[in-house]
């Protein structure tokens, strides 16, 4: 959020965005965490096509409603710009991207530029990971953790070859966005490997200090711009150590429960912040407040940050769950409950 907001800053923007850009591998950590949780939760449950269909439907129901809502907001902006004849707004490019966004395939290489709901390439990438999840299931049931490791290494090797052949517009798979689905699945596979490590409990880690130390090392490596593979390895080791400590002592993070109202809407914060950026910074700040010089940017930007958080919490409560339930359909009954009903 701060990274994108800084582009509107009248001073400090170049230094601030350059510094925060170094932390972008944290997005890879998000996909690793997702791979870990999905594998832990569903790795033993998907046994046939019906299970997979239900899984995919429920996961899409979690992401798709808010993605569509935000996308349609920017479609409306593009239509208004077209009607107003705003030549400074790329409305034609935005409207051309609409079908790709609504189909959530804009991170699969169907376009070479970000448009409309630009941060939602990660939503497209996450849905791709869900669709490809059977590959992880097959590898896991074939050879367990070694099978997951082979899948991960094979996928990364293929991405590295594609990078050498110039397939990725960004130059390398680790910085891909319009083809970010393939990058995300590599991280997702790493998360699945972490799930395998934690399930085996090969190491008895009970303190969160090793995980925090490894995370600090990963952040330092990002800031110092050390090799990306080192950063990814440190992130993976950090998540592994943290997950081992958390599963060994489930109550060890009880003190952090106060932050749950915010952390549970992190997805909403991520998707809503471009809307707040447009309303508060592109419109209110750029058109009126900056020319008037009545408030400092770094005071004003607290308002769109607070608005993003508030809207994300309201959206989670009143929009996402209701629309998501329409897509997900009724939850499957437990097997024992189904047997009782049929008796």
Outline where the language-model segments fall.
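Central hydrophobic cores of alpha-helical transmembrane segments in multi-pass inner-membrane proteins
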Residues: 31-41
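Hydrophobic alpha-helical transmembrane segments of integral membrane proteins
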Residues: 61-62, 130-131, 187, 207
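Lipid-exposed faces of alpha-helical membrane segments in multi-pass integral membrane proteins
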Residues: 2, 32, 69-76, 99-102, ...
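Alpha-helical transmembrane segments in multi-pass integral membrane proteins
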Residues: 2-23, 39-52, 109-111, 136-143, ...
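Conserved beta-strand->loop/alpha-helix structural units within folded catalytic cores of enzymes
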Residues: 34, 64-68, 124-138, 322
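His/acidic/aromatic-lined binding-pocket segments of jelly-roll/cupin-type domains
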Residues: 28-31, 186
